[in-house]
């Protein structure tokens, strides 16, 4: 049985990244470090953002996290509360809704539909905003659908969000390096008017096959940095130093591995898309990013759970 449930690449972490961690251990980087991340690592993230998007981000606005979930949790924990509304995608990464419910806020889903090839509709998101809305969550490319929303739709959404200054934006861009067909990532760093209420989540897990290293980064509004730093200090203390030095090597090193992995994922994407659509009663949109396919099995007369069990046992 092939396990397709985990969102992790099946590639080995590149050797130069592992070597950097080993060197950090040999050099004696064994103790506590800054809760927001060692300066060199935050500077490396800032350089990478500049290289990819031509945008300057102050390293003091960057948090190094043990993966992506702390950014999700801290953002929702700080902004969500009873009486507040948080807008999120469905299908989407399921942790978001459970975190929203934990805070007592109301989860307001916006549907990703087959008519839109599972891409979010910016008009639908904007129409979901009320005076109680405190946070809009975006995942692009999307987990678990593999859909990718391009720049014109993001431009439209960003323009609409300018009219709602009471709303924060959490842009989950963890799959930003995994976009197909030569298309570019329409990052929310492109919108200067939103930076004071924008949280961007990204990291090393997907792009560099480092899921087990527990390394993520996020960029926060300056006014929230003291608060998220306190949460970091009082929860995980700091990300272990050798992993941060490995993260520096990943960001500053060659991108050959990233391109090689994407070539392989592209081959798999085309194969799984064709294979799923060849099955009677099954349709599947071509994934535009990440490494997921999200078939519609309603034509088989089964629901998703029944179809999964049938595939596993038969």
Annotate the PLM regions.
Residues 2-10, 23-42:
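A glycine-/small-polar-enriched, mobile loop at the entrance of the PLP active site in fold-type I
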Residues 8-23, 56-314:
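PLP-dependent class I/II
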Residues 32-66:
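Conserved N-terminal alpha-helix of the aminotransferase class I/II PLP-enzyme fold
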